[in-house]
């Protein structure tokens, strides 16, 4: 029985709403047939390479390197294509050129004695690599990925073969003319970037772009311009989304984490958050307090700090931590249904005796200097703290780059994603065993 024999007047009427909708894009039988042929053909192409990254935590240099080499996929392609026809050192040189074309070209030009000959060999090698990585895509998809400046030339090189006698001279002249017109450097850079792009068909960021690293904003700059990606939000990403949405407890938390790891670059340089009011407040409030236990973890710091700067960051860390406790407690009081009463910590402190009381047990405090905490009303912000948090709020709400990056997170992100029969989500999901089933 054919598919056509299943079509009845009743089924047409039942599907009329969908047929009318489809007719907007495919008004004729020919248009619909062409699209069906195209989609059926695409389904029989090899699946594009999916790249999964998680827990980046602001480490932008590692992130960018992994994107450039596609976690070793480029190296594998080069080995498959050239095998034993190139020495290992030559394959490594070619891979490095693909990863970092601008930098590698400068090194090559400083040492190569016959640069035109090197251009000729390298361009032919790059064409072979590009033909390989583009082979799993339709010509239409490859064409849309090409740089406009060299689109026509690259299409000719990708889809014509030097083995064909009638095209051998044609291809060779294209390459030699690229060299003679002094466009080889730009063309090589364009080809290397294209190889990087085609090697990764889709990028999955499975949580935590933000946290302790110094360059989360640089990572977000890269993602905002990336060709195909999705994000499954991690706890640190959601924290920044909350801060950018105006939640002051989240603002205090992201600042505290930055102080803890000595990374101020994302806040100050990336998003223009003014930390001067916090520094002034911390120096005044904790002038004689060493704040020892709030010293930053300098092995994660974005730069080397002198002793004076480290002391200031330590004071700022303590100041914003106390403010965070107060702001979070106010939310918990306002929303008891959250069931987070156990997170209200300041009320569990016996300030006179310097102990923390939890479930009937007492724990001595390692720090007992809390000049901004009123034991009778521990979660009330002082006037100075209230003024400070208003200034911090203003900085967060008026950062244009932060708004851009958070729009990207909201647009391309979600709590989870089902893709190619994979369930993607950050961290873990609690399971309950019911009989023989996990739910």
For each predicted feature, which ranges?
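Feature recognizes metal-dependent phosphohydrolase scaffolds
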Residues: 2-439
């Amino acid at each position: 029985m054919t598919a056509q024999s299943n079509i009845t007047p009743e089924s047409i009427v039942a599907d009329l709403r969908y047929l009318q909708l489809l007719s907007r894009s495919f008004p004729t039988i020919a248009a619909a047939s062409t699209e069906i042929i195209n989609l059926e053909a695409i389904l029989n192409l090899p699946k594009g390479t999916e790249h999964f990254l998680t827990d980046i935590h602001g480490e932008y240099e590692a992130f960018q390197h992994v994107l450039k080499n596609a976690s070793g996929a480029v190296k594998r392609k080069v080995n498959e294509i050239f095998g034993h026809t190139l020495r290992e050192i030559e394959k490594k040189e070619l891979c490095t050129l693909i990863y970092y074309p601008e930098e590698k070209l400068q090194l090559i030009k400083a040492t190569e004695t016959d640069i035109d000959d090197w251009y000729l060999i390298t361009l032919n090698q790059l064409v072979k690599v590009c033909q390989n990585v583009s082979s799993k895509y339709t010509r239409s998809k490859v064409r849309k990925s090409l740089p406009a400046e060299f689109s026509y030339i690259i299409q000719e090189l990708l889809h014509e073969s030097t083995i064909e006698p009638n095209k051998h001279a044609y291809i060779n002249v294209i390459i030699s003319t690229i060299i003679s017109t002094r466009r080889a450097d730009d063309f090589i850079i364009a080809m290397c970037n294209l190889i990087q792009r085609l090697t990764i068909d889709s990028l999955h960021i499975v949580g935590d772009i933000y946290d302790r690293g110094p360059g989360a904003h640089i990572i977000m700059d890269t993602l905002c311009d990336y060709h195909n990606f999705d994000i499954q939000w991690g706890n640190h990403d959601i924290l920044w989304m909350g801060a950018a949405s105006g939640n002051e407890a989240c603002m205090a938390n992201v600042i505290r984490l930055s102080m803890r790891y000595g990374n101020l670059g994302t806040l100050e340089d990336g998003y223009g958050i003014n930390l001067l009011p916090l520094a002034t407040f911390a120096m005044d409030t904790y002038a004689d307090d060493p704040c020892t236990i709030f010293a930053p973890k300098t092995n994660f710091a974005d730069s080397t700090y002198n002793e004076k700067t480290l002391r200031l960051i330590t004071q700022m860390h303590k100041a914003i931590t106390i403010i965070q406790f107060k702001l979070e407690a106010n939310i918990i009081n306002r929303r008891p249904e959250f069931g987070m009463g156990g997170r209200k910590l300041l009320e569990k402190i016996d300030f006179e005796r310097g102990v923390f009381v939890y479930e009937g047990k007492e724990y001595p405090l390692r720090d007992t200097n809390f000049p901004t905490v009123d034991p009778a009303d521990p979660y009330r912000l002082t006037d100075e703290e209230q003024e400070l948090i208003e200034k911090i709020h203003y900085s967060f709400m008026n950062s244009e780059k932060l708004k851009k990056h958070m729009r990207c997170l909201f647009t391309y992100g979600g709590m989870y994603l089902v893709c190619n029969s994979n369930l993607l989500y950050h961290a873990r999901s609690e399971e309950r065993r019911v009989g023989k089933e996990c739910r």
